[in-house]
Amino acid sequence: MYRHIQSLSHLEAVGIDCHIGSQLTSTAPFSDALDRVLAMIDQLAAEGTTLSHIDIGGGLGVCYRDETPPTPAEYAAVLLPRLKARGLKVYMEPGRAIAATAGVLLTRVEFLKPTEYKHFAVIDAAMNDLIRPALYSAWMDIVPVTPRSEDTPSECYDIVGPVCETGDFLGKNRDLRLVAGDLLAVTGAGAYGFV
């Protein structure tokens, strides 16, 4: 594409962008991607295309449960030393890293549905409000807004929505003390959630 742009008088290639993934919990993929992108920038420069910016994308993970993603300082320590000498404008797309913990999905328990094999807490939120659990079984912390006393028995619930779809759940196998009408907070829902 860059070679083709060189042959067109009405277009100018000014930068290169990459996106290597999402919810990354190690700096190694970022370092590897940067090596590859910088090699491409060097190859393009040798062919006469000088770029003015690099967008290193996003993908930096957050802690939903027990993940240990790199801190922003650790992330920067891997990338900045190699970028400083280039004189390129550097863009990044922190996305989830800044948005996830900024949002909470509040939902109400509509009713409890006990069965012989499993207990369900049917809520008024659904997979269309927060797709991560249904799409790839992502863990989301779900806590009662007002915790119940020990007078309310703890049960192991699947937290499910009202959509007529077997994949409509926000959490599975959660030990909670609940009654119909309780408010639940699904934390870390600021990224990829309708909050």
Regions flagged by a language model, labelled:
Residues 1-112, 170, 174-176:
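Active-site loop/helix belt of alpha/beta enzymes
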Residues 78, 87-195:
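Charged (often Lys/Glu-rich) extended helix/loop segments that serve as interaction or gating elements
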